[in-house]
């Protein structure tokens, strides 16, 4: 007959799960911040150029020729989408962090570091 996991093992598994999910969300936020910074850099560069000037944009691995005037609105929309996603992930992170802290408090978990 298989032995049931102890309460300590269950709590350790839940603790590790919370930590892992928090790290995953934090990594996604960092990735989106990097994308947002890159979009801002491109937007700053393109805003100082003539709208009829040719530029190239990578779409799913294909380099497509466009004009600055057609690319800037698309980049602006993408940048807003990135910001919305970041805000959603930040809210999700804060909610999960509060849930994690409640879990620690309810189960009287103290982190011991060596």
Swiss-Prot record:
SUPFAM superfamilies: Prefoldin. InterPro entries: PFD2, PFD_beta-like, Prefoldin. It comes from the Eukaryota. One of its GO terms (cellular component) is cytoplasm. GO terms for molecular function: protein folding chaperone; unfolded protein binding. Heterohexamer of two PFD-alpha type and four PFD-beta type subunits. This is Probable prefoldin subunit 2. It comes from Schizosaccharomyces pombe (strain 972 / ATCC 24843) (Fission yeast).
């Amino acid at each position: 007959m298989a032995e049931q996991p102890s309460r300590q093992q269950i709590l350790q598994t839940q603790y590790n799960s919370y930590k892992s999910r928090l790290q995953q969300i934090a990594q996604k936020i960092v990735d989106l911040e990097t994308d947002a910074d890159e979009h801002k850099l491109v937007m700053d560069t393109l805003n100082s150029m003539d709208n009829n000037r040719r530029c190239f944009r990578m779409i799913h691995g294909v380099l497509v020729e466009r004009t600055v005037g057609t690319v800037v609105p698309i980049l602006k929309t993408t940048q807003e989408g990135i910001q919305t996603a970041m805000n959603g992930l930040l809210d999700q992170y804060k909610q999960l962090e509060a849930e994690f802290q409640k879990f620690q408090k309810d189960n009287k978990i103290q982190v011991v570091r060596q």
